[in-house]
């Protein structure tokens, strides 16, 4: 088996490649660069591409995917593409139009995975972050079970092959799983996960329910002032990680990615650097010993780089619970 084709089976029968390419970039990165790097990622062997409506780059990501289909590098069915339902579209009647908007931007007929970006509903409208005159977010009240039913309809309509969630805690997952008349379980929960926040309890819970945990921020996140928790350490400068990188003759980033893969986590690697995009594919070329895995477990400090502090007062703010 080609290790680059390493996949996890989802609870609905579809499969997800365990290494994905994250496409999020700060606003100052020119959009044309997104097209370039997404093409580079596909050329390097990435088959799982992760984006979102709110990244404001689905036109470019779609263009890159289509050009790689047109030049014969891949077929559409070789690519696993994820999009996300933004917080201003959580009302059930807005779910399908939001997905259709993403599909129009992408110029694709379907997405492989559509996930609820956060369990936090914001006031519907054009603004991604609707604020009142005091600069506070304007929340909306939506029953997430009703949102989920609308997601199920998108799957039935063939607009999304699989449906899942992101940034949900255990209680919120259980709310969906215990919903009367549930038709499809979420296939995944995409959350921040790395050696400093290893999510061991949430991971065990997800595994027990046959839900795949997908890790974003696996390399410690881009250090964007607006979102970064204050006094955040730099993950890839961690001495244990760096010592291990020397031992295996790999980069600290590869050690961090491999650690998650060996725990059964699907990992998103985000990079706009050509050399590192290619380098990240080497994660399939080596294995960490169980002793080294234990040492990496010891790095956990429950540090969340992206606490979404601006929504802390929302009744469904997910990070107040232990997990």
Curated annotation (Swiss-Prot):
Function: NADP-dependent oxidoreductase involved in steroid metabolism. May act on various hydroxysteroids.
Positions of substrate binding: 31, 117
Binding site for NADP(+): 20-24, 50, 166-167, 190, 216-222, 270-280
Name under which the protein is recorded: Aldo-keto reductase family 1 member C23-like protein
One GO CC annotation: cytosol
EC number: 1.1.1.-
One of the GO biological process terms: progesterone metabolic process
Residues marked Lowers pKa of active site Tyr (site): 84
Species: Equus caballus
InterPro entries the UniProt entry points to: AKR, AKR1C, Aldo/ket_reductase_CS, NADP_OxRdtase_dom, NADP_OxRdtase_dom_sf
Tissue specificity remark: Detected in endometrium surface epithelium (at protein level). Detected in endometrium.
EC top class named in words: oxidoreductase
Location of the active site: 55
UniProtKB keywords: Cytoplasm, Lipid metabolism, NADP, Oxidoreductase, Steroid metabolism
Gene3D superfamilies per record: NADP-dependent oxidoreductase domain
A molecular function GO annotation: ketosteroid monooxygenase activity
CDD domains according to UniProt: AKR_AKR1C1-35 (cd19108)
Subcellular location(s) per record: Cytoplasm
Similarity-based family: Belongs to the aldo/keto reductase family.
Subunit and partners: Monomer.
